[in-house]
């Protein structure tokens, strides 16, 4: 079983590496094509291979390129089968972290919560794979305040690491009543860059396909690389107006890393993207939107 998993993982990484090489080659061809069409100078770094690239352009067509990619491998059952989400915490969780994990369980339809106990990460991931879990969520804390969220897609990855801030739990708001467990409609706003679409896919595939008459709405709104999570239900007051009611919890997410492996492969998996906060231009740059 372990050898089979290792082989499947190697095959997936090989496909991913080939796709990345093909994408880079296609970008170089596109730069040469645009320079020729617009009668501009060819970029300096491409001048040595410009003739070879121009020759290969003759054989390019719309064809089937780009129809499938590694995202299709990772989320091939998205929309066909409902995701199976497992939520757990770091070791020795405080009462507030347990409370937050319970509230996250209400956010994701069909999710299950598992007490961490003294289980190691490798044992957790193996148990999740054996039981058909598609996503493992781990919540971390600092002195009773939730500060981190890890989303690991199974069986091959990716794994996204987020910082949590400005957390307001349902338990902190009086007289909220019971939360709806209907399959929610999703609003994804501000994810216009390539990395933004990647993060949008990681988050939206945690939810099943909603029914048309669902009154529940979950929003992930990106602004300056901070993703605001909001949870509402709505009702129609008349044929023109809709009344929104926030049911919580609410928090902000800040992405700081995406790894290509699962959670237990932290030491060996390749890093797809990492935030570098200590560079001179870090405070000026945004990554999740193209604006």
Swiss-Prot record:
GO terms for cellular component: Mpp10 complex; nucleolus; small-subunit processome. It is found in: Nucleus, Nucleolus. Residues 83-264 form the Brix domain. GO terms for molecular function: rRNA primary transcript binding; snoRNA binding. It holds the Pfam family Brix. GO terms for biological process: ribosomal small subunit biogenesis; rRNA processing. InterPro entries: Brix, IMP4/RPF1. Keywords: Nucleus, Ribonucleoprotein, Ribosome biogenesis, rRNA processing. It comes from the Eukaryota. Part of the small subunit (SSU) processome, composed of more than 70 proteins and the RNA chaperone small nucleolar RNA (snoRNA) U3. Component of a heterotrimeric complex containing IMP3, IMP4 and MPHOSPH10. Interacts with MPHOSPH10. Component of the 60-80S U3 small nucleolar ribonucleoprotein (U3 snoRNP). Required for the early cleavages during pre-18S ribosomal RNA processing. Part of the small subunit (SSU) processome, first precursor of the small eukaryotic ribosomal subunit. During the assembly of the SSU processome in the nucleolus, many ribosome biogenesis factors, an RNA chaperone and ribosomal proteins associate with the nascent pre-rRNA and work in concert to generate RNA folding, modifications, rearrangements and cleavage as well as targeted degradation of pre-ribosomal RNA by the RNA exosome. This is U3 small nucleolar ribonucleoprotein protein IMP4. The lineage of its organism: Eukaryota, Metazoa, Chordata, Craniata, Vertebrata.
């Amino acid at each position: 079983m372990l050898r089979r998993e290792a082989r499947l993982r190697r095959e997936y990484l090989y496909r991913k590496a080939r796709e990345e090489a093909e994408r880079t080659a296609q970008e170089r061809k596109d730069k040469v094509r645009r320079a020729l069409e617009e009668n501009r100078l060819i970029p300096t770094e491409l001048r040595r291979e410009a003739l070879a690239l121009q020759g290969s352009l003759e054989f390019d067509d719309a064809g089937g390129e780009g129809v499938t990619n590694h995202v299709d491998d990772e989320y091939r059952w998205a929309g066909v089968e409902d995701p199976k989400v497992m939520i757990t915490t770091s070791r020795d969780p405080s009462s507030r972290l347990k409370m937050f994990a319970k509230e996250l369980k209400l956010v994701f339809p069909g999710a299950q919560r598992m007490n961490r106990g003294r289980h190691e990460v490798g044992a957790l991931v193996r148990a999740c794979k054996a039981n058909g879990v598609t996503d493992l969520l781990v919540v971390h804390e600092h002195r009773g305040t939730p500060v981190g969220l890890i989303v690991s897609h199974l069986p091959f990855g990716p794994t996204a690491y987020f910082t949590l801030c400005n957390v307001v739990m349902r338990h902190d708001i009086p007289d909220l009543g019971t939360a709806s467990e209907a399959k929610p409609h999703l609003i994804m706003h501000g994810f216009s860059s390539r990395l933004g679409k990647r993060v949008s896919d990681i988050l939206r595939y945690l939810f099943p396909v909603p029914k048309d008459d669902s009154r529940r709405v979950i929003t992930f709104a990106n602004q300056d690389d901070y993703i605001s999570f909001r949870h509402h239900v709505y009702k129609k007051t008349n044929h023109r107006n809709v009344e929104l009611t926030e049911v919580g919890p609410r928090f902000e997410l800040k992405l700081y890393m995406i790894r290509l492996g699962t959670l237990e492969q932290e030491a060996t998996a390749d890093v797809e993207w990492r935030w570098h906060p200590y560079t001179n231009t870090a405070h000026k740059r945004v990554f999740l939107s193209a604006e």
